[in-house]
């Protein structure tokens, strides 16, 4: 691995990886819809994490698909994986923790298989891909759509959230990922919780904080995106900050807002532009929804605005990531701001 065989304690580690990747690293795409395409039944509160117990080979297949497509970073199937969630399905605490570790190990196994057997022509001159351990929000565990609103109720406190995330974070970090991706963060409070847990637990693995937005100005909760990004900027354990699971049409403006409060690399991996309806567990077309061609046509704009890591989230596919990788690697970026590359 580029990170020397395991996690390292070095400020700017992810920035260095981006530089080695040519100035812009490619993040993978959606997991759940790809698992369904391979035959997985995800009608469950655990969502894609269900496959950690029932079909880890399908998760490995999806990781391999993204590596073949040119991803520089693959994200573990732990977004919806929690100790409490697994226990509610009858697993013991020890079994639940082992399933969390498995999410990282399956991704690492896919990387090993790709290195030994895959078509590595797309990686010529690029560092080996990184494995990011995904940490989803408390709302993702609730599986009621509240990760898209940030509304956890007035009784939810910072200590409550710390107690929910602490052991899960410790287990995932102990599995040896290259970095930790705190994803689809809907509010400033949860970002503060993550930052404090990283410090309090002495976790030395580089991390990124990625928020979600419904309006291109604020996080899902209504907290201003610049205030949320400032939390990430103030945490020395956080190497990058950005947005995910957000409509592509909002990404450019969000990058510009985030740049005002941080010089850290910016990561963006939007969804397809469709809207998730929690009541029916469906994604529906909405204004601004884009196909792969239109989605990828925005990559240059995002890159010029300052994005240093670009990928896709819900409803994107290996085809999307392949097109992103092609756009990133073929385009000329003479006017890219130095902060995104150095």
UniProtKB/Swiss-Prot annotation:
InterPro entries: HCY_dom, HCY_dom_sf, Hcy_S-methyltransferase. Disulfide bonds: none annotated. It comes from Zea mays (Maize). Monomer. GO terms for biological process: methionine biosynthetic process; methylation. Keywords: Amino-acid biosynthesis, Metal-binding, Methionine biosynthesis, Methyltransferase, S-adenosyl-L-methionine, Transferase, Zinc. The gene is HMT-4. GO terms for molecular function: metal ion binding; S-methylmethionine-homocysteine S-methyltransferase activity. Catalyzes methyl transfer from S-methylmethionine (SMM) to adenosyl-L-homocysteine (AdoMet). SMM degradation (by HMT-1, HMT-2, HMT-3 and HMT-4) and biosynthesis (by MMT1) constitute the SMM cycle in plants, which is probably required to achieve short term control of AdoMet level. Zn(2+) binds at residues 245, 313-314. This is Homocysteine S-methyltransferase 4. Its EC number is 2.1.1.10. Residues 13-328 form the Hcy-binding domain. Its cofactor is Zn(2+). It catalyses: S-methyl-L-methionine + L-homocysteine = 2 L-methionine + H(+).
């Amino acid at each position: 691995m580029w990170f020397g065989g395991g996690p390292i304690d070095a400020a700017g580690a992810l920035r260095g990886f981006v530089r080695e990747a040519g100035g812009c690293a490619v993040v993978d795409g959606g997991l759940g819809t790809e698992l369904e395409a391979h035959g997985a039944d995800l009608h469950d509160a655990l969502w894609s994490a269900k496959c950690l117990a029932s079909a880890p080979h399908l998760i490995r297949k999806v990781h391999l698909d993204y590596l073949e497509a040119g991803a520089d970073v693959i994200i573990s199937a732990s977004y919806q994986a929690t100790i409490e969630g697994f226990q509610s399905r009858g697993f013991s605490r020890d079994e639940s923790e082992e399933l969390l570790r498995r999410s990282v190990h399956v991704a690492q196994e896919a990387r090993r298989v790709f290195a030994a057997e895959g078509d590595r022509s797309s990686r010529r001159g690029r560092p080996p891909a990184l494995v990011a351990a995904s940490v989803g929000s408390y709302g993702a565990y609730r599986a009621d759509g509240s990760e898209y609103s940030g509304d956890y109720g007035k009784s939810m406190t910072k200590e409550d959230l710390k107690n929910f995330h602490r052991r899960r974070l410790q287990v995932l970090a102990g599995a040896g990922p290259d970095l930790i991706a705190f994803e689809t963060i809907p509010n400033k409070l949860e970002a503060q919780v993550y930052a404090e847990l990283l410090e309090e637990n002495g976790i030395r693995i580089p991390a990124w904080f990625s928020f979600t937005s419904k309006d291109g100005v604020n996080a899902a909760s209504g907290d201003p995106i610049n205030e949320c990004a400032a939390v990430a900027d103030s945490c020395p354990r956080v190497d990058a900050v950005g947005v995910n699971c957000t409509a592509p049409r909002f990404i450019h403006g969000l990058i510009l807002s985030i740049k005002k409060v941080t010089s850290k690399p910016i990561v963006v991996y939007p969804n397809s532009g469709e809207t998730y309806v929690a009541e029916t567990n469906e994604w529906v077309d909405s204004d601004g929804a884009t196909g792969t061609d239109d989605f990828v046509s925005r990559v240059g704009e995002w890159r010029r605005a300052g994005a240093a890591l670009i990928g896709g989230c819900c409803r994107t596919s290996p085809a999307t990531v392949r097109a992103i990788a092609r756009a990133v690697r073929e385009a000329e970026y003479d006017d890219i701001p130095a902060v995104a590359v150095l």
